[in-house]
Design a protein with these regions (language model features):
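N-terminal capping/linker segments that flank leucine-rich repeat
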Residues: 1-74, 79-81
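Conserved hydrophobic beta-strand positions in leucine-rich repeat
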Residues: 64-66, 84-86, 104-106, 124-126, ...
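Canonical leucine-rich repeat
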Residues: 74-77, 94-97, 114-117, 134-137
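Thr-biased low-complexity repeat/linker tracts and other Thr-enriched repetitive architectures
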Residues: 88-92, 112-113
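Ankyrin-repeat and related helical/solenoid repeat scaffolds used for protein-protein interactions
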Residues: 117-144
Length: 144
């Protein structure tokens, strides 16, 4: 005879699949970041950037500081970020930005264009770059 008080098996499976899915996403980020780190150009401090990205992902942090690392490119960024500081690097372009991003500091780089900016963006600092114009930014309240 089967016990009556057993919880349904699907409850545990949903949690297992959710955890597995999160682990897969984390592993995808990590493998991309390892490859990006291996392709470092002289003068870049990608090892420090990798460590900061990894800690941000593991701790589900919403703020990421990759400033002053001599970076010429960025890897794909975690989706949960709402604040990014990539100032004082040598970036000529930015990757696709997280949809929930509220603050972006990309000042003192070599940007000549910006990717599509998230509608959630409230603050942007792109001073000291090679930008001639900014796209329309309806939700931004502070521009530098």
């Amino acid at each position: 005879m089967l016990p009556v008080n057993n919880p349904p098996l699907s409850t545990g499976n949903v949690s297992f699949y959710r955890t597995t899915s999160i682990d897969n996403v984390h592993n995808n980020y990590l493998s991309e970041w390892v490859e990006w780190t291996k392709n470092s150009i002289s003068g870049e401090n990608r090892e420090t950037a990798f460590t900061r990205l990894q800690l941000c992902l593991e701790n589900s942090e919403t703020s990421l500081d990759l400033s002053c690392l001599g970076l010429r490119s960025l890897p794909r960024l975690p989706d949960n970020l709402d604040e990014i500081n990539v100032s004082n690097n040598q970036l000529s372009m930015l990757p696709e930005l997280p949809r929930a991003l509220k603050e972006l500091n990309a000042s003192s780089n070599q940007l000549s264009a910006l990717p599509e900016l998230p509608v959630s963006l409230e603050y942007i600092n792109v001073s000291d770059n090679h930008l001639f114009a900014l796209p329309e930014l309806p939700s931004v309240t502070r521009i530098y």
